[in-house]
Amino acid sequence: MQVNVIERRPDNPSELYAGSQLGLFKTTDGGDSWADMGLELGECEIFSISLHPTDANTIYVGLDHTKISKTTDGGANWTKLPTIQPESAIPGCFPVRVLRMAIDPSNPEEVYAALEVGGFIRSLDGGATWEDMSQPFVDLSKKPHLANHILSDNDAEGMLDLHALTISAAQPGVIWIANRLGLFISDDKGESWREYGIDHYSELTYGRDILPSPHDPNVFYAALSDSARGQAGSLYRTSNLGKSWDRIDHDITI
C-alpha cells in the first residue's frame, strides 16, 4: 500500500487519516490501530484529505480523475461531488489529481482544490457545485518568465501544475498556492492571482508545499526545490503572513 496523504485532527493529535490507493483509513489512538472508513475508490486513489474546521463529521477526500468525495456523518455515508475538470487541464503520464484542498476557516462552505496538472476549482456551497477558476493562471503564463511546459507544448502547463494551497485563519479569503513556478496569492477567493516573488529569498523556486502553523496562524512554512526530479531543496518560514521569509533548514542532512 502506498500512502499518499496523512491528515491530523488539529484539536486531537491522536486522530489521523491516511489516504492511499486502497482506501481511506482512520486512527484514534495515534496509529496503534487503523479502521477502513469505507470509501469506495473504483479505479482511483486518494491524494488529499481536508477536515472541516468546526464539524468533526465532515470530511472531503480528493482523488485522481478530478474526483472529490464528502461525508457529513463521519464516514458512515459518502457522496461523490459533481466536480469538473477544467478545459485547460493537461493529463500527462497520470490522470489529473486533486492534490490539495483547503476550506476557508471563516466560511467553511467555501472549498478550494488544487489540481495536478489541471488548475484550480472552487465551491462556494460546500461542494454542491464547482467552478473552474483556472483562467487567471493561464493569463499569468503569458508572462515570459512564467511560461513553462514539460509534459506538453502548452506554455500554461507550469502555472497549472498546482502542488499545494492553504488558507490561514489570520487571512480570511486569502489563498496561497505553491506550484511549479513558485508561490502565488489571491486576495479575492481565487478571482485573480499575483506572484509572490519567493525568488527574492530563495534560489530554489519550485513550490512543493505551503502550510500554516497549527499553533500560530501568522506563521507559514514553504517547501521549495529546484525541479520535479531534482535533489536540492529548502524549507522557509514566515512569521508575518509572508511579508518576509527565513530559511530554517540549515545544517540538516537527510
Tell what function each PLM region has:
Residues 1-254:
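Extracellular glycan-interacting surfaces
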